[in-house]
Every structure is written in structure tokens, then in C-alpha cells.
Design a protein with these regions (language model features):
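C-terminal structured interaction module
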Residues: 89-120
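Hydrophobic, often amphipathic alpha-helical segments used for membrane interaction and targeting
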Residues: 1-86, 104
């Protein structure tokens, strides 16, 4: 992820994102609180909605950055995880925004026939 963040984008883009975050820190903190609250409630739909609402915001990832950071990685994991899970009991930990949506890791695994249950 750090390679994608720091080597996959120009210093100008990194500076733009940092300045945007600093200039909008209150809104960014509030957004993170909402996302954390939805995560703690295991409310994937709200998590996805919060993520989608940020689209077009200058502080948000560009579509190509979002693909690189989230969706392409989900696809790779969904391809690799079955062999890993077949070999041994497996606990998979990923960032919260890898979970929801049609291209989310949970949906990709369900489409392969896996049963997904939240941890309680």
C-alpha cells in the first residue's frame, strides 16, 4: 500500500492530497468518525455510502488511485485466498473499505461460493 501511495503518484499529487486534508481537517475527521462508527456497527452499506459520497471531492482518490489501492488488490486477494484458506485455517485482515460494494472482497469471495459471517 505504501508503494502505491508514495511511488505510484507524483510528489505534486501527494502534496495536493496532504494540503487538501490539512485545509479540510474538520470535515476529514468527521468523515473518519462516521466511517469508524459504521465499521463498529458492521454496517457495510453505510461504509460504502460514505466512501461513494467522497467521490469528486479533491481530497479523495482519483478513480485510477482507487482502483490501485482498493479494487485491484481485492481482485488479487480473491484469486489467492482460496488456496491459502484451503491449506489451513485462515484469518484475513484488510482495511475497512476493502469489504463493501460490488467489487468488495466479501462480494468477490461470496461469488466463489464462500459463506461470509461477521465476527461477533
Amino acid at each position: 500500500q505504501f508503494n502505491l501511495l508514495f511511488n505510484g503518484s507524483s510528489l505534486q499529487r501527494q502534496a495536493q492530497l496532504l494540503m487538501c486534508t490539512l485545509n479540510n481537517i474538520e470535515a476529514e475527521v468527521e468523515n473518519l468518525k462516521k466511517l469508524t462508527n459504521a465499521y463498529m456497527k458492521q454496517d457495510l452499506n453505510t461504509m460504502f455510502k460514505i466512501s461513494e459520497e467522497r467521490k469528486g471531492n479533491q481530497c479523495d482518490a482519483l478513480p485510477s488511485e482507487e482502483d490501485a489501492l482498493i479494487y485491484n488488490r481485492n481482485k488479487i486477494w480473491a484469486e489467492k485466498l482460496p488456496a491459502i484458506m484451503k491449506a489451513a485455517p485462515t484469518f484475513v485482515a484488510v482495511g475497512a473499505l476493502h469489504l463493501p460494494g460490488e467489487k468488495g472482497l466479501l462480494k468477490l469471495l461470496k461469488s466463489q461460493g464462500y459463506t461470509i459471517e461477521p465476527v461477533k
